[in-house]
A protein has these predicted regions:
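A common structural junction motif
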Residues: 76-84
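Short S/T/G/P-rich N-terminal loop/turn motif that feeds into the first structured element of a domain
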Residues: 1-53, 63-72, 87-114
Length: 114
């Protein structure tokens, strides 16, 4: 099993008031559905620290799937929905190796909103 990951991070420093809610709404109403069942993607998580950063963490089936997505996304990153909501392009688009994933006793809980 491959651990081909990608992190995309936006800064929320100086972002408009209400950006955290707008991002959570966008994920719940649009982005979650886009990535659910996506070929080549094992899973994606969306993470945020209010006033600091918002990011997507992706794990792909292999490096080829990650590289293809990364190339496609990087070309339009400045105009991506997250960039439009935040008002700036990502500050980081970085591949990584996911060393391991553990499923807890209560199982994974895929949800459009936590």
């Amino acid at each position: 099993m491959s651990g081909s990951g990608l992190t995309v991070r936006w800064s929320l420093v100086g972002a408009p008031d209400g950006v955290e809610k707008a991002l959570a709404d966008y994920v719940a109403e649009t982005s979650h559905a886009r990535f659910t069942g996506m070929e080549g993607l094992r899973f994606k998580t969306w993470r945020m620290r209010a006033g600091e950063w918002f990011e997507g963490c992706y794990v792909f089936v292999d490096d080829a799937a990650r590289a293809a997505f990364q190339e496609e996304f990087t070309a339009v990153a400045a105009e991506a929905p997250g960039s439009r909501i935040i008002g700036s392009a990502p500050i980081l688009i970085e591949e990584c190796v996911v060393v391991a994933v553990a499923e807890g006793g209560d199982g994974f809980g895929a949800a459009a909103r936590y």
